[in-house]
Amino acid sequence: MGKGKKGGKRMSKKQLSERLQDFFASQPGKTLSFKEIFRALKLDTHPLKMLAIDIMEEMTWDDFLTRVTESSYKLNTKGQVQEGTFIRKSNGKNSFLPDDGGTPIFVSERNSMWATNGDRVKVSFMARRKKHIKEAQVIEILQRSKDQFVGRLRVDRNMAYLITPENTFVHDIIIPKRKLKGGKDNDKAIVKIMQWPDAEHKNLIGEVVDVLGQTGDNDVEMNTILAQYGLPYVYPKAVEEAAERISGEITKQDEAEREDFREVFTCTIDPRDAKDFDDALSIKQLDNGQWQVGVHIADVSHYVTEGSIIDKEAVKRATSVYLVDRTIPMLPERLCNYICSLRPDEDKLAYSVIFNLDDEANVKDYRIVHTIIRSNRRYAYEEVQEILEANGVIDGTGEPAPKAPKGGYKGENADKLVTLDRLAKLLRAKRFKAGAVKFDREELHFDIDEHGKPIRCYFKRSRDANKLIEEFMLLANRTVAESIGKIKKGRKAKTLPYRIHDNPDPQKMETLRQFIVKFGYKVKTDGTKGAMARSLNKLMDDCDGRPESKMIQSVALRAMMKAKYSVHNIGHFGLAFDYYTHFTSPIRRYPDTMVHRLLTRYANGGRSANEKHYEELCEHCSEMELVAQNAERDSIKYKMVEFMAEKLGETYDAHISGITSYGIYAEIDENHCEGMIPMRDLGDDYYDFDERNFCLIGRRHHHKYQLGDAIRIQVAKANLEKKQLDFTVAE
């Protein structure tokens, strides 16, 4: 016993082996002598020293270590060094993504060098020990993805620190009391790192740069989500002041230079709570029987000069952000909600695509022009839907209203709205016939009280009134892209930001095929674009209304490439368009403003714009779009958890919406809130995940949980900080 105590507690061979691995991994490339190793690991007894020497010898057989001399070793990195991106996971399963697009490689916490998610790093590959997965270790952090972090302050008498959500770091960020900037215990705050850990300093040291307010306050929590993604939660005063100086007056020169549509029936159709009206539609019948449909878009580029302080802020933001209870606009409120917004009964400047359509919705002619419009009516989608249904339209069938009765269609401007709907449905049918992919996704919505609390939770799906607007916006975007990009063979098109969507990823399509075959479905994983699209549409139709439908749609969406902006056109797979851009939402998307400016430039005989400059802007806008989407999803998750937090202990009918190796996802039938039943809480048996058949099977009683099964759940936990709901199976 005496010998065991001298060097501290006894150590097994496995424990000592792990300590030796960690020690060598922490000092890649360094030759370490027995003396240094024994001292660092406090191996004071002869048996422990001999055991360490034996283990190191075995490690040379595994190619984990290289013997340098009789009494020194070093880590065998095999000289493999690569650069790439570090991906941090809250469960400790961090990974390294090589720049060359290779397979992600595991990086243990001890080998991460305090890298944070998204950091550019250099790694060396550790020699793989027998029965061990391939591992990398960070040897240099090339570029930090960020140096500011958002979290909750804990302040006591002796110290203060920041707790980050999702456990960004193994240890919390220590904050000197003098650097709190007035922050109090339980406040949400933004902290900047002053000192990263290194060989001499083991702690993260930070300072508060902004205090957001007390945890739990609705405004504070929404601003926290924005801050976590580096999105602005306040508008710079100088930019707002610049917007105040802009006049909304329409001059005689404006009238002289623009087509006047103020006498043509025009309306906007938007969500009930919308304030920024980007687009309007006008319609009239021409003497030749054709329909003149105008797609009128707010002329933002007339008011926002390229390179101005407002423009620079818009570039930085690149998009408006739509959280559950608020909009964070790309442009100052005076512009997006007033001057540019196509409000009813006000003269407005627009950039318009005017179509002449025959009765079959074939485009017989078009022109792209600057206009002055005056919206006669501001409709909510629900109002238009009511008018359509009052005149015989059955939502979702794709069928237009029957022929007008003797007294005409019922409702305000019903004849015009019914005609627009009929033309839109013809356009939609042509698009799907050409190979467009059909994904009708439902979105979770909340009714919010005056304090920002969710009081109702429900799904909203796109209806015929939504699709009416969508089809004319798609037509305008496509036409604008063709007007610049579609040129004679052998000539080079002028620079334009396109909205591109590549063909599905073949490997992910194969994953989809393997997944759906378990449910008896098929899908084409190769072939022409049209064949793949038709196959995907058949799959969506076949599984519609089935228990597995939601999960199949989710896996199918993951097989799709992400749409993005680029000056290098490859077409749009999902829409089946060879040319497509974004022209119709310049109030909330910067690429649309770019397109407006370039159209004007080229219409005035200007030369092609700098391709490299516009590609850089496209890449930035694509990145910011993803950031905004993630923030929007987080706000939905937060409100869902907040909604259920007051219902702890309550039981609900639900159905199984997802199954993984670590538990069951269940969606409540009544309100569509989704939570997880961890595997450890399925206490009636020990369950195995059957990956082939996508179910859990009990070892003793052989009870099975599978997709779509009805299940009675009890709300167990609601973690607002992590935005997670936990359920248990109700007794």
Stretches with model-predicted labels:
Residues 103-108, 169-175, 672-689:
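A short macromolecule-binding patch
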Residues 2-294, 301-347, 378, 385-386, ...:
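Charge-lined substrate channels and their catalytic hotspots, especially those that engage the 3′ end
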Residues 39, 190, 195-197, 214, ...:
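Electropositive polyanion-binding surfaces
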